[in-house]
Amino acid sequence: MAALAAGGYTRSDTIEKLSSVMAGVPARRNQSSPPPAPPLCLRRRTRLAAAPEDTVQNRVTLEKVLGITAQNSSGLTCDPGTGHVAYLAGCVVVVLNPKENKQQHIFNTTRKSLSALAFSPDGKYIVTGENGHRPTVRIWDVEEKTQVAEMLGHKYGVACVAFSPNMKHIVSMGYQHDMVLNVWDWKKDIVVASNKVSCRVIALSFSEDSSYFVTVGNRHVRFWFLEASTEAKVTSTVPLVGRSGILGELHNNIFCGVACGRGRMAGNTFCVSYSGLLCQFNEKRVLDKWINLKVSLSSCLCVSDELIFCGCTDGIVRIFQAHSLLYLTNLPKPHYLGVDVAHGLDSSFLFHRKAEAVYPDTVALTFDPVHQWLSCVYKDHSIYIWDVKDIDEVSKIWSELFHSSFVWNVEVYPEFEDQRACLPSGTFLTCSSDNTIRFWNLDSASDTRWQKNIFSDSLLKVVYVENDIQHLQDLSHFPDRGSENGTPMDMKAGVRVMQVSPDGQHLASGDRSGNLRIHELHFMDELIKVEAHDAEVLCLEYSKPETGVTLLASASRDRLIHVLNVEKNYNLEQTLDDHSSSITAIKFAGTRDVQMISCGADKSIYFRSAQQASDGLHFVRTHHVAEKTTLYDMDIDITQKYVAVACQDRNVRVYNTVSGKQKKCYKGSQGDEGSLLKVHVDPSGTFLATSCSDKSISLIDFYSGECVAKMFGHSEIVTGMKFTYDCRHLITVSGDSCVFIWHLGPEITTCMKQHLLEINHQEQQQQPKDQKWSGPPSQETYASTPSEIRSLSPGEQTEDEMEEECEPEELLKTPSKDSLDPDPRCLLTNGKLPLWAKRLLGDDDVADSSAFHAKRSYQPHGRWAERAEQEPLKTILDAWSLDSYFTPMKPENLQDSVLDSVEPQNLAGLLSECSLGNGHTSPGEGLVSYLLHPELGSPKEDNRGHPSYLPLQREATEASELILCSPEAEVSLTGMHREYYEEETEAGPEDQQGDTYLRVSSVSSKDQSPPEDSGESEAELECSFAAAHSSAPQTDPGPHLTMTAGKPEYPSTEELSQPELPGLGNGSLPQTPEQEKFLRHHFETLTDAPTEELFHGSLGDIKISETEDYFFNPRLSISTQFLSRLQKTSRCPPRLPLHLMKSPEAQPVGQGGNQPKAGPLRAGTGYMSSDGTNVLSGQKAEETQEALSLLDRKPPTPTSVLTTGREQSISAPSSCSYLESTTSSHAKTTRSISLGDSEGPVTAELPQSLHKPLSPGQELQAIPTTVALTSSIKDHEPAPLSWGNHEARASLKLTLSSVCEQLLSPPPQEPPITHVWSQEPVDVPPSMAVTVASFCAPSPVDMSTLGLHSSMFLPKTSASGPLTPPAHLQLLETRSRVPGSTAALLEPTPDASGVIADSPGHWDTEVPTPELLGSVESVLHRLQTAFQEALDLYRMLVSSSQLGPEQQQAQTELASTFHWILNQLEASNCMAAANLAPPQTLPSPDPLSLPTLCPLASPNLQALLEHYSELLVQAVRRKARGD
């Protein structure tokens, strides 16, 4: 493609264009790839020399302002001598010459926004007032643009200012909380008179003879008199004398405008109220007459000698005669809201009225007595200047339409030399919270195809997103508030980010709600709209055209990245979830090799490289940089070699895009406050512009870090910056709704062009080499070999420069390896290295493999490094446990022999391979299935041939990952869930062919860190077990569901977006701290995730609540579907309703070797229990079909009180992940793997609560344990193993804290349920004593941490309104929280012991311990209490005469639950066994009796585990021998 990417610059195109312009010949296209970048320190001849402070300030000048922040008539004024109009725009006063359409600018010396201004009667001076604490009243010379005087006399802001007609005095009125009214002698800089006003003052006006002035406001019209005699005698400040106007029956009105009469009406005063009343006061301050304007609201007033103009709502300006208040006419209305300015080519279009159109309200008026022009400012931030000499033929002199709310982003349209351009050269685009995208062009000689419209000389086109016009008017203009008060705003409105495609044909935009839209730029039609994210889209980026593939990446506050293929109608290629917080920037890099770089508020930078797989392009992480500061933005230079990152500590860090190493770090802001929010590199790669939260903009030399220029002017933080392609302008946008166009000085422009020519000279002298993939797979990062680098002046190079020239070749010429045996290496986990580590590596920068070979004997110790390989034991993960995170497996050129050496990489794959190789069927055959990628069909096309929606193609996993799916996944889906699931799993087996080179995703617990004493090899071995048994069958929903861990209730994915917050008014007036913090909330507080925004951990940590299993999230965005799949498949298996759970006695043990076939899923992980461990069971497949049929017949029943005692796990997952604040790359590497970024196994982490001591009397915890735990805790003597391979377990040195032991251990089953109760003691089998002694009981202080919420007892009857639990259930929950509530224990009858004794499957027959009896008594007591509470609740519902829908639903669910319990008891013969068993009888130690809690009764399952162990031992031995 020959287009320029909007987010980056094509160097060859820019060089050729600039070269041809300088040579005076037409430019031509060159398709050659750009050469490598010169080293960062080479550019010395073109660097600007250090300059004094004044020179730095003047190197960049403000050329044009597109925006206005005037909120009332106090922000608009007119020069009575020349007719120039002055208005406020942030911290700048814009003086406009309407005739010539030229602007002059006066900058406020401080960074406080301006609130009011007024011209002097002679037009030489302007007085301004400020916002903020201790504001200053300043006098400016209009011609010189310098400050003449400043006066400090207010505390909280200035509402309005005015010159006296004789120019002796200036009057300033403070805000309501300031309450100070000052009369200044501005030439002497003293306060002549002062007084306090208790009410809010909105406007003031001087009389023509300067003897008095009038202030109006809330129920306030007051005349203030200046006595010249008293003033001459008194040198100090005197009280200001005021008299109230006599309002009569209008005393309750709010007056918003005032003007003293002129000419023959000089003795009269005119006021207008919000309610639409025009009032006239005579010389005696008496209300003489008033007129109803017949409008819903009026806001401003302006008078001339003969006319009175009243600004009202809906664009109405009424005109009256001054001497008689006779109504004359109305001014023509401005444009209607939503007008297509591109169609307004004829002047008659302005006077065309559209039916039911809405017009913007008038908010400010000023009159030019010289030209008889009336200037009007409307509520949508538009300005019109009308010629009112003849009120019968009013004409428009000048107009402009600006953004009315925060401007979030700016993009410059690419330049083309042919006719492919959709927009004229020099066009730039801006997007705003007013839900518009605006196209601007300041070139008067632009393309004739785009004619100038009658509305604006610079605005070409306005795209109204979804035709929304409700946000076009500034919400800060309300009649019941002053300009100093904030207004809650719709935080979800507006376009947040946009990007132009490289070919200039498409415009991608993301809004505040997470929607992604694609517009085509020929006709501005919306092609695609998709709900992509659950929170606002923060960044968009198209890939570079040199790479040969066109991708679009979108990143959001929901911390997900979606990669779309533009060439496939924006089909979804991959979803990445590496980041643990909001993603602030994403960029594509590389020329032929596609690279993706992203940074976020989690202080991490991820470097990824693309790999071509059979099902599409996938990105694999190659480098991860963890900084100690938040990263807000980044940009890539023209050479695609360096990426500049804006950091919270006000530094700019420059990294190499290939190696991920930091090359430079320098200050990005000259101040000592705030954070860097934006960074942008110019088209030549010479300078970069930065914006700081202190509202400043800096221009910095990219190579030296020296500040070239710094600018101020915006009243809010700068949200976007772009250089133009001609290297002459810098465009900045801000939260003050203004767009500033800065003109770069000639020395800066010359320097940029010179650098482009130097790069062009380099390109002509070197021969680019072909870039190819390496043949065999390497354990290092894949990258292309660059061409030779030639420096500009080798004689002047320093040692760092020479090192930088040699570094790419050293990094990219990694030798290939035939074996998977990795080099010994240090895991660098904590920032910069100490000296010993640098000596170990041999160099500070270059860390190639040779350094490790030379230092094999040195073994460092400390928290900065740990051995990645330990002797003598080697595990099967040695070859890939570390390198797979950073080594992309290139699909092309991989031979079958290579694949054989790489795959399989986990025990499940090893099992399947061995089975095929031996020619017989193993017990584990059929347990592993490939992940299917269902297609939702091709996108539908509209009548223009474009897709009307974004099709979700197959999930972006690394081709087809290995995964086990349990048939119960289908059982757990009801209603729409099952239909949606079946639709997603329609893909045929052809999708899984040819993709066997990819790895298996593993799942581990990520809520706690692993024990410090566990070795690296052991951790890797545990990870191998986790990866293997993530593919284990789970066909026993009953006992497994009793082990579900208690979880804190997380909000649904609908709530995973940024909450609405009260914000700043859309003007530039942040008069309260809440307003000043609004924009910073979107940048500096990206890391402060609220409770509704759970993006602190991995996707597996985001669990679905009990009440959301059977309801869809109403927002079906890509992120929602991605999260939904991960929630239902990554950590916890789908839970069955209570009435579908089968007791252990009722579950037949599978016989024979046939195991249920795994069903397909769309996630890359196996089913795990809630505590992160797998569960092995042996239920027959027929039970799955039976449960499925039950599911079709019975409504879903929630988890009732009968299961609350068994719902707890070893530890409740933490609600805040440790990854939120850590900067350790090693720690973040071990978090969950992205569904679309399979990077290898993750080190399993054991929850720390496993080591907590047992608390007697607490709840029984059902966790997986090994048979080795059946020995007594006191003597720790291991019991003989009844299954598995003894040699394997002995050689693996598995400890009690290993995760793999939990994965292989049989899950305990739920205790038997009985209906017989008494208070007599009962004996418990010793096997249960051992099991209970091995369990960990949680603390009884706060059961809410274990998930005992009200939503666990009663179902949610609808997706929106949960059923409130009755008092009985709330009482039960309250009792469970009280530690003393378990003091009086109810005990079952002795007959109950027979149920336990006679039930099959005890491990041992030892005498029960007293601790066990106490635990069992506690469980039985809670069971009795829960059953009694449920029974009482059911009786109460049955006895009630009037039941609502929720109560009827609760009654039905309770009845269904009771019926299910009864059926289970009858099926398991528990009641008969309880009647026949002798009381107080212990079971005989009969070796033939099978234990109830042992699920290994199936010989097939036992044989499978033994075979697993044997295969593992063989793999370890083979690996140790180096096979």
UniProtKB/Swiss-Prot annotation:
GO biological process: cerebral cortex development; mitotic spindle organization; neuronal stem cell population maintenance
Location relative to the cell: Nucleus; Cytoplasm, Cytoskeleton, Spindle pole; Cytoplasm, Cytoskeleton, Microtubule organizing center, Centrosome; Cytoplasm, Cytoskeleton, Microtubule organizing center, Centrosome, Centriole
A GO cellular component entry from the record: centrosome
Composition bias type Polar residues, residue spans: 776-790, 1167-1177, 1199-1213, 1226-1235
Region (Disordered): 762-824, 1000-1072, 1143-1258
SMART domains for this protein: WD40 (SM00320)
Gene: Wdr62
Modification Phosphoserine, positions: 33, 501, 966, 972, 1117, 1143, 1169, 1234
Protein name as catalogued: WD repeat-containing protein 62
Phosphothreonine modification, residue list: 46, 1072
WD repeats: 109-150, 153-194, 196-234, 291-330, 357-396, 411-450, 490-529, 532-574, 578-618, 626-665, 671-713, 714-752, 803-846
SUPFAM superfamilies on file: Nucleoporin domain, Quinoprotein alcohol dehydrogenase-like
Organism of derivation: Mus musculus (Mouse)
Expression sites by tissue: Prominent in neural crest lineages from 9.5 dpc to 11.5 dpc. Also expressed in the ventricular and subventricular zones during the period of cerebral cortical neurogenesis (11.5-16.5 dpc), with expression decreasing in intensity by 17.5 dpc. In the cerebellum, it is strongly expressed in precursors of granule neurons at late embryonic and early postnatal stages; by postnatal day 9 (P9). Present in fetal brain, enriched within the ventricular and subventricular zone (at protein level).
